[in-house]
Each structure stands twice: as structure tokens, then as C-alpha cells.
Amino acid sequence: MHAAPCGAPGPRPRFELADVAHLCGDELVRAGRLTAEQRKVLRAISRCRTAELGGHLDVCEDCGYERPAYNSCRDRHCPKCQALAQHRWLQRRRERILPVHHFHVVFTLPAELRPLVKANSERLYALLFATGPASLLELAADPARLGGEIGVTAVLHTWRRDLGFHPHLHCVVTGGGLDGRGQWHATRPRFLFPVRVLGKLFRGKLLDALRRLYARGKLVLPGSLGDADAFDELLDRLYHKSWLVYCKPPFGGADAVYAYLGRYTHRIGISNSRLLDVSKRAVVFRTRSPRTATLPPRVFLARFVDHVLPPRFVRIRHYGLLASGNVNGRLAQARRALGPSRVAEPAPAPEAGHDDARDQPDHLRLYRELTGIDLRLCPRCHARAMSPRPLPRAKQPRAPP
């Protein structure tokens, strides 16, 4: 675990998701409606960067200034633990971004399917990944449209700004593809595929897959859907409904894609900075500026845990040219076909001073790159003399069975 300083410089949100978890997390657990993973996430968020997880004491060897630094929970649902993970992920991905324009495509599941998704989250999220990108790849392979293999990075989001349940898939799609002869075919500058055609293809693939899962007895059917006729009627209605697929105009080349991925890949349902007030009566949070929402704490927390992913579920996936099996083959071939180009460069790190920043431990170096703050500098005397000393982990009462 990495430790974050309690007194690190920089703005700190007045309220945190952990405050809501402390207020009513136990009450929600006692109600017995949480999965083991949801309970684990609430516990991690409640303990993140507290003495319960242990840590160390940064002590200035020159003036004696002390600053406790407690360990992070590193849970992917924790709003305090995403920045370093996101930065590391982007550094690994940046060299794979092709120097072409890209499109942003969003596949959204109809509201009628949300109860079924909640009851079968792992299967249905996987189905969304299996059908959305496959629809893009199929249209791209059609010689009448593009006649090549595109690259797709897909990211699962499950929320609206008010924390309502709204599963959808964000896809970053290359504005062109590689054909079987190694030639690159670019799309038109502001047009990928007809969204109505894409929506129909996505709808057909997903509903056909749902029928197959149902026939094999692989679905948990909530409420009235347990009746075979009700399930068939639902799918029939959805076959005759237009499905929402959104395709945004393209953003620029590699630099723009790099910046965009930085905003979307490790986003969670809500950030601490959006919390405006937390009390026993209500949680007030920002939705879309200047709009806000107000919910009872228990309702707010219940909405948040709806977005806890199944254990080990991969929420960022790559397809086509960007699939892991194509990195050294088709992707490299596409790069050669496109010719020499500049790959997106990360923002330069702050000057390292007398000691090279590369000599710092990884988390200290990344923290410095992201914030410009050197945690080895003493806030009081400004000597580069902060050194860590162990802190004991706080004792906890034994949890109930």
C-alpha cells in the first residue's frame, strides 16, 4: 500500500464519501441487501488513509517536523485512490495510440433491462462488452463501408450524474482501419458509421445473446420476468424499440485521445469534490453545474454501491487492432502504414532539483509529476530531509460474523 500524507499541501474536499459510509454504512450492511463485494468496498473506503490501515511518520531530519502518512486502501471504487492508478495506466497505453483522428461512441442499454442487469451484473456487463465493440468491428470490416480492422478501447460506466443506475459503454474508435493487404483506410473526417444502422446491429446482437442465455438457464430473472411469457414479451418490445447509440464528432490525434482517456478510464460514480454537504439528514452533491441533488444518506449510499463491479471484473478492454494479441502484429503494421508520427507525450515532470526524481520511490515520483509537490521537502524548513518511520496500525474491535 502507498501512504498519503495527512497534511499534504493542496486543497482537500470538505466532505468525503467516507463520511457518508461512516454515517450509515453499518445500517445498510445490517439491512442484509449488500453483496460481499459491496461490503468490502464500503469497509475499504471507510478506512482509507486512516490509522486503521497503518502507515508511517514523515520526520524532518533537520528541524524535527512530523507529518503522519496513512496507507491508501487502493480499492478501484475509492474516490481517493484513482489518480496514481490512472497515471500508471495511461503511461502504459500511450505508446499504443495511433496518430489518427478518433471517434467517441457510446452504447447504452435500455431502461427496461436495468433490473435484469442488476440481477446478472457480471454476465450482462460482459455481454455489453461482447456486443458493442463487435458491432463496430463488423461494420468496419464491411468493404462497402471501410473494409478494414479498426481499434477500439471500451470503458464501462454504470451511473448517471445523480448516481442513478445507467449502464453504458464508452468506446474510443480509430478513424480508420487496416485491410488484409496492410493498407490503411481512413474514415471520412466527421463520419464513422450511420448510428441507426449501428444501433440496430447492437440491439440484434445483444437480444439474441440474451435469448441464448435464457434458453441455457443462465439468467436470474427478477420479479415478473420469472414468467417465460413475460421475458419473451420484454425482448419482443425491445426488438421494436430504437436503441440509443451516440457517436460524437471526432477529436484530434494522439494527444487528444491521451487527454480524453485520462478523463474517462478510472472515473467512478462520484468524486469527493462533488459533495457539497453531508449530514445525518441529507447528502447534497453537484450533478451538472449549477444543478445539485439532495438525497437521504442511506439512499445516497445505496445508489453508490449499485455501481460496485463484480470481483476482478475488467472494466477497460481493447479490441481489433488494440487487442493484446495484435500489439506486436497488426497494430505495429498499422503504425508502419501510417508512416512516421509523433506519439502523445506526457506532461513534463517538475524539475527534480539537486536529486534526480528517478531516484525517488515510484509513488513519490508519480505524486510529484501529478501535483508538483515533493513529499520529501519539509513544509516548515524546506529542507529535502523528510524520512519515513513506521507507524503502528490502529487496533480494531473484532467485526461481527
Describe the residue ranges of each PLM region.
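Beta->alpha loop/short-helix hinge microenvironment recognizer with preference
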Residues: 1-401
